[in-house]
Amino acid sequence: MATLQSLADLGQANKAALATADTEAPVHVQKLDAQGRAYATGKRKDAVARVWIKPGAGTITVNDRPVDTYFARPVLRMILQQPLHVANRVDQYDIVVTVTGGGLSGQAGAVRHGLARALTYYEPELRSPLKREGFLTRDPRVVERKKYGRKKARRSFQFSKR
């Protein structure tokens, strides 16, 4: 390690460190299986979604059923289609999803997480807009456990003063 004699030397050392940091940025490459599909998993609460995408007409199949029948509420369909809207890729990919565990809301969040990850595997340049919107980050919030001496996680038993 070189010794620094003045502030100018410190500035030069800092520029050299920044230059090496820029060149060592990870290069994301396309990850496809033998059938030309991108595969990713997504998680939310107790739900785990396995997502496969390939170029197509825009059909979304969840557990061998159309998305309109599996997620009957429009809000849930909107949640899982958010990555496609951010990436401007609506009706460009056929999506096949297998999702297990949790409730419908957690499953929709898991599908959204997996779909965003699969899109980045198919088109690595979409990583920055999807990351900016927070779709690539796994939501760490889970149900708090019940404690003994309490009715629920935080709710106490009813107290009678007399």
From Swiss-Prot:
InterPro entries: Ribosomal_Su5_D2-typ_SF, Ribosomal_uS9, Ribosomal_uS9_bac/plastid, Ribosomal_uS9_CS, Ribsml_uS5_D2-typ_fold_subgr. The keyword Ribonucleoprotein applies. It holds the Pfam family Ribosomal_S9. One of its GO terms (biological process) is translation. PROSITE patterns: RIBOSOMAL_S9. Gene3D superfamilies: 3.30.230.10. Belongs to the universal ribosomal protein uS9 family. GO terms for molecular function: RNA binding; structural constituent of ribosome. Keywords: Ribonucleoprotein, Ribosomal protein. It comes from the Bacteria. GO terms for cellular component: cytosolic small ribosomal subunit. This is Small ribosomal subunit protein uS9.
